[in-house]
Amino acid sequence: MKIQLMLTTLAGITSCFAFGEGFDYSFNLLSDHSVASNSAQDDNQAHRLLFTTEWQWQMDDRWLVAGNLKAFRGDNGEGLTENLQGISNIDAEKFSKIYEMYVQYQFNAETRAKCGQVDANLEFAFVPVAGAFISPPLGITPTAIALPTYYDPALSCSVFYEPEQGFQWMGGVFAGRDHLDFAEQFYVVEGRYVTADTRWSYGFWHHNGDWEVLDQNRIKAISGWYLNYQRQLNDDWALFAVWSSLNDEVDITRQHHMLGVVRQFEPHQLGLMVSEVTQRYSTKDYLAEVYWQHQLQPDLALQPVLQWVNHGEIGLKNQWVWSLRLNWSF
């Protein structure tokens, strides 16, 4: 499952160390341990670790070179539930690799260009206020099946126009074949409207490769759209909503809808969300999550999580999933 991994979730409050002029680096360890009821596996538990090393070199006021390495070890927790939306945004098979490597040029305070190997979901189709949830749909919506994100970013070039408030515009082209080959392309364009307490984002994506529709015919390309909203109600409460669609019948997924709230009271944070995916052949697939995040130290956070999975497939029992996330930066 393609899922999103937001840097705010992975890095938490990151400790950075200077190494020469303009050079910074940081390390992060993210640990998830989950226990599921009614699991089809013999073992109803999964424990996994994601290590991240990030670095950046600010060459001058305009040029930035940055990248990160990631390594995943442990169990792929997707097998605990086998639901459409997943339960952890770090689940994967074992890997170690250069995850991102890019160059960024800042034209002015509002405009920048970014080229290299990039996780698209760190720039497009995300909801900032929802960054602490561990559920995959809080990153990338399940309908954007071609978006190059965790755990396979892609070569790309993107341009961003981002004034502090008002309308923002951005777009990018990504290698659409094996994440390295531009013989096929993935395009995404996004517009935002940002005020002091509100953020709307609306986007359209298109992949021009050959995708097989469910009746075994061939089509040239697929596309979809998304609409994200978040509002800061006051210093403590924020709410968010997501609505997205896959336009072509190359997957059982059709639309994704999500609502959630976040309550911030230092050193704690509380989050609650409900996510729904409509499908072609099955009833709706639901996922709900509530978490309590406690900042034990500036570089160490503990986060108990409870999830409820309502399967869209007939015959599968609903499931409860208890998880404990540890986020340590050093």
Kindly give the residue locations of the regions a language model identified:
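Solvent-exposed loop/turn segments connecting transmembrane beta-strands
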Residues: 41-45, 149-151, 176-183, 217-220, ...
